[in-house]
Structure formats: structure tokens, C-alpha cells
Design a protein with these regions (language model features):
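Protein-protein interaction/assembly regions in multi-subunit complexes
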Residues: 1-412
Length: 412
């Protein structure tokens, strides 16, 4: 496969590009990763055993659980800050997580506000403070503003901070204004755990419409409609046809993407990070094969010479791609069947089921998996390089963390 990136349209808020020369499993893996697998700095407030937020005082109309949920939805732009430690942070799939956690443990979000006025007070991210536990002081507010930046409309200079909670004013001398006092540690996570941790507000793709074929089909339809419709009715029906039926006429293996970040990462960076995460996951799968962790067993469900390759903690993102590459590489000369399925969404594993023309050993199956993984890594390296040509190839080196990750992955 030779992926091609074309039709790049990069604006201040949105990135559009065309990915062609690849199967839909590649495009879908890229989209799934951008939507759910890109890690970022977060406020973890659920489940209760992992909650990092603490409320000392809350007299607002919202109880603590609602405020915790609202807190977890606030994006944290630590990558935009000038804190020196965060310059080199690359929150990868496996690497650097321990380093990131150690840095995040230094900081504590604090909020302490009381409404002493006679009108409702809006408590926003502008009121947030960040305490450096090692230095025993608060980081400067201009730095906090970079981490929790306001929204500035294109046509105005007004700054709009994210509203967290409203504090009602005091009613009498005996009934004071509402107060909120809380703190929270920083953590890291991805939208796979909770949708509030997503780094994109738009991430979609569709088949590239074959404009010439679609126009020819429309002219045929207009000619057909002319016998029973007026000119105005034909024009209206043509517009209606373009909304749906036109999109069914598309170029094979060509997809138009639209990506819109919530602001933590640049739009192009989101695409390249998705490529890097997929490459890391493929390397990790390859490492599991070399470490003899990959489980291969005889399949009881179909013909002889059939085997099930069990992928732990990998879903359609990796499994469908791997199945596709194995299929086009080895069918029908070596294999007579190659399929993929995750039996239930809650399962921690999925299955690639293969059937061979002749009996084979596990080592042969592993080598075929490794060959397919190498081909997929090359595809995503090329996609990444097409978006940022000046960057060197993304390098992944196994670390001591990988063994710990494998131990976690390959447990029932």
C-alpha cells in the first residue's frame, strides 16, 4: 500500500485532507485513534476509588458529583505552557507515562471563591490557581492563563473563560453568599476511558465522491425526471439527490477527513500523534510476539488447519488492519480464510481466525503476523511523513515499561 495525502486545507480551526491508496481499515484506524486514544492531561474524578478532586466547602446549588463531572470536562493546555518540564513531554502510548505522572504529581489545582457581592458571581477557569508543591508557591497567573486559556472570538477582543459554577449572592446578613473551595491533582488519560477527555471536537471521514461519475449520473436522473416534473421540481430534486445519492458514487480507497481540535493540540499534530500511537501499538504487538506472549490456538469452529490468534487489549483499530493485510498477502496461495471479530464489546480480547491450505506451525503464523505488522508500520510512517515532511521517522524503542504493560495486557 502506498498512502497519499492530498487536498490539504488547513485553517485556524479545521484541517481537511484526503487519504488515498489505502483500505478503509487504515482510514478507520486513524479516525478511531484520533477520537479515543490520544492521551492528554486531565482531571480524574471517576470512579470514586480513583477520584483526585477534593471538596472542602460547597454551598452552591450543585452537589459535589456534578461539580466533579464539570471539572473533568475542562481541557488542560499544559502543552501550551512555558513550564520547562513540559517542553519535552510526549505523552505516548507506553513511553514517558511514568515521567509524565511524576511531573504532574508536583502540581495541585486550587479554587477558593466566595460571593460577597449582591449579584450572581460566575466562577470560571480564570479563578483557578495552580500550586507547585515542590516549590511551595503558586505558579504565576499568566502561566495559568496559558494552561486554561480563554476563548477569543475572531471578530472581537473579548476573552471568554469556561464557566465552572455560579455563586448566588447573600440574601441577608444571616444568609451569606455561596462559596466553593476545592482542589484537584492532575492526571492523564484519553477519551477511551471517558468522552470528556477527548482532544477533538470533530473527527470524521467519508468516501471521496467521484465527481465525474456523479455528474453523469445526475444528468441521467434529470433526463429521467424531465418527463414527469417541471424545471423547478427537477432543480429541487437534483439538490435533494446531491445530499445523499451522490455520496454513494465514490472513488475506491480514497477518503476525505475533517479534523477539528478542541485546542490542546494543533489539528495536524492530532493526525501525526494518532499515527505515532498506532505505530507504538504495532511495535508493542510485535514485541509481544517476540516475547512469546501472543496466544495462538487451534480453532474448533471451522475447517482443519484453522487457528485463532488472540489479541489482548486490541480491538478493531489494530485487529481489522492486521486481518486485512494478512488476507491480501497470503490469500489464496497460503490461506483459504482470514477473518476478524471481537465477540462482545466488553471482552478484553479479540480474535483473528485463519485457515490454511496445508498444516502450519505457530512459528509460521507468528512470522506472517510480524510481516503484516511491518507493512502496517510502513504505511503509517508514510502518512505521518506526508503531513510533516521535515520530521524524521518516528522511532520506537522498547523500555522496561513494556514488560509491565504486557503483563497487564495478557491477563484474563
Amino acid at each position: 500500500m502506498e498512502p497519499v495525502i492530498s487536498n490539504n486545507e488547513l485553517s485556524s480551526s479545521r484541517y481537511k485532507f484526503r487519504l488515498s491508496g489505502v483500505n478503509h481499515t487504515i482510514a478507520n484506524a486513524l479516525r478511531r485513534t484520533m477520537v479515543s486514544d490520544i492521551p492528554t492531561v486531565i482531571f480524574r474524578t471517576t470512579p470514586y476509588t480513583e477520584n483526585k478532586a477534593s471538596f472542602l466547602k460547597n454551598t452552591t446549588r450543585f452537589h459535589n458529583e456534578i461539580l466533579k463531572q464539570r471539572l473533568s470536562c475542562i481541557p488542560i493546555h499544559f502543552m501550551s505552557s512555558t513550564i520547562s518540564e513540559f517542553y519535552s513531554i510526549d505523552i505516548g502510548y507506553v513511553d514517558n507515562l511514568l515521567k509524565t505522572k511524576k511531573i504532574l504529581e508536583k502540581y495541585l489545582l486550587e479554587l477558593d471563591e466566595t460571593n460577597t457581592s449582591d449579584i450572581t458571581m460566575n466562577v470560571t477557569t480564570e479563578h483557578f490557581k495552580i500550586f507547585d508543591k515542590e516549590a511551595n508557591n503558586y505558579i504565576p497567573q499568566p502561566e495559568v492563563k496559558l494552561i486554561f486559556p480563554p476563548f477569543i472570538p475572531y471578530n472581537r477582543d473579548t476573552e471568554y473563560y469556561i464557566l465552572y459554577v455560579k455563586l448566588r449572592p447573600k440574601i441577608t446578613d444571616d444568609i451569606p453568599g455561596e462559596s466553593i473551595q476545592m482542589s484537584s491533582e492532575f492526571s492523564y488519560g484519553s477519551a477511551k476511558e471517558d468522552g470528556s477527555f477527548s482532544v477533538v471536537q470533530t473527527c470524521a471521514y467519508g468516501n471521496t465522491v467521484d465527481e465525474e461519475a456523479a455528474e453523469l449520473k445526475l444528468q441521467e436522473k434529470r433526463s429521467e425526471w424531465s418527463s414527469t416534473m417541471t424545471v423547478d421540481e427537477i432543480d429541487r430534486e437534483s439538490e435533494n439527490w446531491k445530499l445523499l445519492e451522490r455520496k454513494r458514487i465514490f472513488l475506491p480507497n480514497s477518503f476525505d477527513f475533517t479534523v477539528e481540535s478542541i485546542g490542546i493540540y494543533d489539528n495536524q499534530v492530532i493526525v501525526t500523534k494518532a499515527c505515532e500511537i498506532i505505530i507504538e501499538r504495532l511495535y508493542l504487538l510485535n514485541y509481544s510476539i517476540d516475547s512469546d506472549k501472543l496466544e495462538i490456538k487451534t480453532s474448533p469452529n471451522i475447517t482443519e488447519n484453522s487457528y485463532d490468534i488472540i489479541l489482548f487489549n486490541d480491538d478493531y483499530t489494530i485487529g481489522s488492519m492486521l486481518q486485512y493485510v494478512m488476507y491480501i498477502t497470503y490469500y489464496p496461495d497460503v490461506m483459504n480464510y482470514c477473518g476478524y471479530k471481537k465477540m462482545h464489546p466488553d471482552d478484553s480480547y479479540s480474535i483473528i481466525r485463519v485457515s490454511y491450505n496445508e498444516p502450519v506451525g505457530n512459528e509460521t503464523i507468528k512470522e506472517q503476523c510480524k510481516t503484516s505488522i511491518v507493512l502496517l508500520i510502513d504505511v503509517f510512517q508514510k502518512i505521518r511523513h506526508s503531513i510533516i515532511p521535515d520530521e524524521p521517522l518516528f522511532q520506537v524503542r522498547p523500555t522496561v515499561d513494556w514488560d509491565a504493560v504486557l503483563e497487564k495486557f495478557y491477563k484474563y
